[in-house]
Amino acid sequence: MAESRIHLKKNEEKAYQVGILALQGDFDLHRKAFEKLGCSVCLVKNVSDLNQIDRLVIPGGESTTINKLIDQYDLRQPLIDFGRAKPVWGTCAGLIMLSRDSGDERINPLKLVDIDSARNAYGRQIDSFSEVGDIQLDGKTDRFKMVFIRAPKITRLGDKVESLGKMKGDTVMARQGHLLVTSFHPELTDDLRIHEYFLKMEPPKR
């Protein structure tokens, strides 16, 4: 496994106020990953928490449950507004929530990233697997161990969406400006390169 090669300077660490949506799912491993990088992490459960951060991760989990809880906690419009102004990264179920079309009538995605997704397209829980694929970070192509758990598939990429990672020909990592999505779970490995890449993403210029 490739080791992380980007090291944040001590005087930069306090600048990162990372939020992780903590309604359900795989938020704690993301927290640990960012804390290893010296970041301040907030587990986001309400609008007040959103106001404390400058970037957000929507983690993996059960997308139908996350969808319901977003509405239950009145977070839908605040999340849309946040995603229009600041960096957001969606992993697995988070990718589904950021997409324009989830292919599932039970899910009303946030429609922030111009992609379509298909739930569980790489199989259900018993079909979870890992595969080494290619990612492009800062213009360089490298290998990355990708862990897929009931992973969604990106079925359409919009014109403004850049493919940054592929596995067997499928795009499994993509970026649209200040928004990032991955079908796989980088937080389930010890490789922090994608977490570091997300930290370097800038909000849109106003």
Can you describe what each PLM-predicted range is?
Residues 27, 50, 97, 104, ...:
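Flexible, glycine-rich phosphate/dinucleotide-binding loops
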Residues 63-134:
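Cysteine-nucleophile active-site neighborhood
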Residues 1-72, 78-81, 192-196, 200-206:
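N-terminal beta1-alpha1 cap of cysteine-dependent amidohydrolase-like domains
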Residues 58, 90, 182:
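Redox-cofactor binding/interface segments in oxidoreductases and associated redox assembly factors
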Residues 23, 91-93, 113, 150, ...:
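A secondary-structure boundary/capping signal
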Residues 41-42, 88, 179:
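Hydrophobic anchor at the start of a short beta-strand
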Residues 2-9, 119-206:
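Amide-donor transfer/coupling interface in amidating biosynthetic enzymes
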